[in-house]
Design a protein with these regions (language model features):
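Residues that define the transmembrane beta-barrel architecture of outer-membrane proteins
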Residues: 10, 39-43, 68-72, 111-115, ...
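Repeated loop/turn-to-beta-strand initiation elements of outer-membrane beta-barrel proteins
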Residues: 24-26, 53-59, 82-88, 96-98, ...
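Outer-membrane beta-barrel "beta-signal"
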Residues: 47, 324-332, 337, 357-373
Length: 373
């Protein structure tokens, strides 16, 4: 669907095109969205087989590869009732090896797998408004080792049950816009199987609850539909200190873009983005953006909690920059350059600012290119 000028002044129309999905579809992508630990440059492939058995089911295969990691996902879903109930099952596997020795001379190696069941049901389905509810159960397993000695650094399982609501709404306010939102609550259990790190997990209770939320608004600013403003927020709250696999992160191409992937991890946090976009000739879109986020590392602090970052328990990151996107006939290429706003709150024992990837890059650039077929 897309927004376009209405028949009368001040009106916005929503164009919805209903088409039968192709039997097979896919996407290939190259980007630098990965972690420096396992290789920033990534290759991505996504393949979908639609209506596999003739009942509206879908089989999906996704993969991501970098210099030091390989990730794969297999998912299947099918309609379970005439009124929109859909059931699904998915599994993932990832292995990694630390290809950069900035964090530790011994590096790290490990793997992880997940398995999950899902159910989704539409509460509201209309041209202007949609509201869906979801129920998911996931099992996650992680193993991390010292690459030199093969000693287990950490091994643990997580069981999660989550309930969620998500939706969108199209309206004609101020020239037309699209609003989206989602909320979810997760009830989880952490089972630490083994570790060689002293005190690992001592301040991370096994049972936890967390609440996650997100929302966005894409608002037209001009009558010609060429200029828009985009606002997005997201975050999470938690009952106790969380394991790193369940934490909230601020940095990266989908967060505060002036900072690297996995920067600013915490049990609780919030993130906001403001972006002004202008469509240009030849299918280009220019944007200017501002990102800001706050993270609380621990719900409950303990002796020695600061570790190597020497930051306050609660701190903020900010950044601003420019982006350019080109879309044409299945091709999608975009890039962004972001500068830090304010000082970096993370520093080492010598008082030097440092990021989680061992660099102090400023500005920081992100680029991705994909083709959909």
């Amino acid at each position: 669907s897309q927004l376009e000028p209405g028949k009368s002044d001040g009106e916005t129309a929503v164009r919805v095109q209903l088409t039968e999905p192709p039997v097979a579809a896919g996407r290939v992508e190259l980007n630098n969205y990965g972690s420096r630990t396992t290789g920033a440059n990534q290759g991505v492939i996504a393949l979908n087989a639609n209506n596999v058995t003739g009942i509206g089911d879908q089989l999906a295969l996704n993969g991501i590869g970098s210099e030091g990691s390989q990730y794969g996902q297999l998912a299947y879903s099918l309609p379970a009732s005439p009124n929109g109930l859909r059931l699904g099952a998915a599994g993932t596997y990832m292995n990694y090896k630390n290809v950069s020795n900035y964090a530790s001379p011994n590096g790290g190696v490990g793997d992880a797998w997940t398995a999950g069941l899902s159910a989704a049901y539409p509460l509201i389905r209309s041209q202007a408004t949609n509201l869906n509810t979801t129920l998911n159960y996931d099992i996650k397993s992680y193993m991390n080792k010292n690459n030199t000695t093969q000693t287990v650094i950490s091994s643990y399982n997580i069981n999660n049950l989550s309930l969620g609501l998500s939706g969108n709404h199209y309206d004609g306010f101020g020239g037309g816009g699209i609003s989206t939102g989602s909320v979810s609550v997760v009830f989880g259990y952490l089972d630490i199987l083994g570790t060689s790190a002293p005190g690992y997990g001592a301040y991370t209770p096994p049972s936890f609850t967390k609440f996650a939320f997100s929302g966005s608004r894409n608002q037209q600013l001009t009558e010609d539909g060429l200029t828009s403003i985009y606002l997005a927020i997201s975050g999470q709250l938690a009952s106790v200190n969380l394991n790193s696999a369940e934490q909230f992160y601020l940095g990266g191409p989908y967060g505060v873009r002036a900072y690297p992937v996995a920067q600013a991890a915490g049990t609780q946090g919030g993130l906001a983005t403001l972006e002004v976009r202008r469509q240009l000739p030849q299918n280009f879109t220019l944007s200017a953006f501002f990102d800001a986020g706050t993270v609380q590392q621990y719900k409950n602090t303990y002796q020695g909690w600061q570790g190597l970052t020497h930051a306050n328990n609660t701190y903020s990151l900010m950044g601003a920059g420019l982006g350019l996107k080109w879309i044409y006939d299945g091709w999608n290429v975009s890039g962004a350059v972001a500068w830090r706003v304010g000082s970096n709150p993370l520093y080492n024992q010598y008082g030097q600012a440092v990021n989680t990837d061992g660099t102090n890059t400023n500005p920081r650039g992100w680029i991705t290119g994909s083709y959909t077929f």
